[in-house]
């Protein structure tokens, strides 16, 4: 599969790292970003959180050279002017965060690409796929613009699926304690979205909205109207944690919930959901490729139907890994 990356920020760079790390059959032809190629090369080579890329990396004649691989740099603001038709692009990995509406993402298709995968929650009627949860519903005949949901939805959905399949869910509230991201400010400043969001990310725990819980219903429709949530942005570089407070349909014990999570992590959700019963903290999961790591020691029960569950996730690496998984699934099932 021939792909291009539009937007080479945190997720775009980590997606490329994952593709190259696993020697994927996915071939990256080009990267489109308005930042100069030499600066993008530097940011790809050196990463303050995930370390230096282990191969030779350099910029040469408007190309990113990684080992023996050569990837063209483009710098085009107008998506419809991009040379996707000439390059024979099968799929655009849309990582700018700007083209989340179907009509905007379809501009890549108008430029000659066959499909678009958005690395963010899609707006409107864009099909949303979470690996391990509903990815098998992908239809190559009609799903040309798709979304990989958000990192938080990718963490919450596997946990919710295990609960739904084994015990049923009456209702639930989710809180994600989320690492800082590039959209936040280092010192206080104005924010268009909400005033609190403009406060300095190094000095504050910042309450924020998130559509992650409601977005779970896009891949698990049975939960519509049963889940919602919020976020706290906290001053750490990477790794976030979901706190799910949930009322179940069936009476059970916390031990039985743990057993169900462990079994799922070893069978249907292997490689997606992990299970830990060790005394872990957030930094222990930097670089984790799992969507969700269920923390058996952190959860609690109030009674036989009301529980608080905890799951960790590397909101960068875990999410980027799922994008590559979804790419490869689309490739395999579009032939």
Swiss-Prot record:
GO terms for molecular function: glyceraldehyde-3-phosphate dehydrogenase (NAD+) (phosphorylating) activity; NAD binding; NADP binding. Its EC number is 1.2.1.12. The active site is at 151 (nucleophile). Catalyzes the oxidative phosphorylation of glyceraldehyde 3-phosphate (G3P) to 1,3-bisphosphoglycerate (BPG) using the cofactor NAD. The first reaction step involves the formation of a hemiacetal intermediate between G3P and a cysteine residue, and this hemiacetal intermediate is then oxidized to a thioester, with concomitant reduction of NAD to NADH. The reduced NADH is then exchanged with the second NAD, and the thioester is attacked by a nucleophilic inorganic phosphate to produce BPG. It is found in: Cytoplasm. This is Glyceraldehyde-3-phosphate dehydrogenase. It catalyses: D-glyceraldehyde 3-phosphate + phosphate + NAD(+) = (2R)-3-phospho-glyceroyl phosphate + NADH + H(+). The record marks 178 as: Activates thiol group during catalysis. It holds the Pfam family Gp_dh_C. Homotetramer. Pathway: Carbohydrate degradation; glycolysis; pyruvate from D-glyceraldehyde 3-phosphate: step 1/5. D-glyceraldehyde 3-phosphate binds at residues 150-152, 181, 210-211, 233. SMART domains: Gp_dh_N. It comes from Chlamydia pneumoniae. NAD(+) binds at residues 10-11, 33, 77, 119, 315. Belongs to the glyceraldehyde-3-phosphate dehydrogenase family. One of its GO terms (cellular component) is cytoplasm. InterPro entries: GlycerAld/Erythrose_P_DH, GlycerAld_3-P_DH_AS, GlycerAld_3-P_DH_cat, GlycerAld_3-P_DH_NAD(P)-bd, Glyceraldehyde-3-P_DH_1, NAD(P)-bd_dom_sf. It comes from the Bacteria. The keyword S-adenosyl-L-methionine does not apply.
């Amino acid at each position: 599969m021939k792909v291009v990356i539009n937007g080479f920020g945190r997720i775009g760079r980590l997606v490329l790292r994952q593709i190259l790390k696993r020697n994927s059959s996915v071939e990256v032809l080009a990267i489109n970003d308005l930042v100069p190629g030499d600066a993008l090369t530097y940011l790809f080579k050196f990463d303050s959180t995930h370390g230096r890329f282990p191969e030779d990396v350099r910029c040469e004649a408007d190309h990113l050279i990684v080992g023996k691989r050569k990837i063209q740099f483009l710098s085009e603001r107008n998506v419809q002017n991009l040379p996707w038709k000439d390059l024979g692009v099968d799929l655009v990995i849309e990582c700018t965060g700007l083209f989340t509406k179907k009509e905007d993402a379809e501009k890549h298709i108008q430029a000659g690409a066959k499909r678009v995968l958005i690395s963010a929650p899609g707006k409107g009627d864009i099909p949303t796929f979470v690996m391990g949860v509903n990815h098998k519903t992908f239809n190559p005949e009609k799903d040309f613009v798709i979304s990989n949901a958000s990192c938080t939805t990718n963490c919450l959905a596997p946990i919710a699926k295990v609960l739904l399949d084994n015990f049923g869910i009456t209702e639930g509230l989710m809180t994600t304690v989320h690492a800082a991201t590039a959209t936040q400010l280092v010192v206080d400043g104005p924010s268009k979205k909400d005033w609190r969001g403009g406060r300095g990310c190094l000095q504050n725990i910042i309450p924020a909205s998130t559509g992650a819980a409601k977005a779970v219903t896009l891949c698990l429709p049975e939960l519509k109207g049963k889940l919602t949530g919020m976020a706290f942005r906290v001053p750490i570089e990477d790794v976030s944690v979901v706190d799910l407070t949930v009322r179940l349909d069936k009476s059970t014990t916390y031990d039985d919930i743990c057993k169900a999570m462990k079994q799922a992590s070893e069978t249907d959700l292997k490689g997606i959901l992990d299970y830990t019963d060790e005394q872990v903290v957030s930094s222990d999961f930097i670089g984790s490729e799992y969507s969700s790591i269920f923390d058996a020691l952190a959860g609690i029960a109030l009674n036989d139907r009301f529980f608080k569950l905890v799951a960790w996730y590397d909101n960068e690496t875990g999410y980027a890994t799922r994008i590559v998984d979804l790419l490869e699934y689309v490739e395999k099932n579009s032939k």
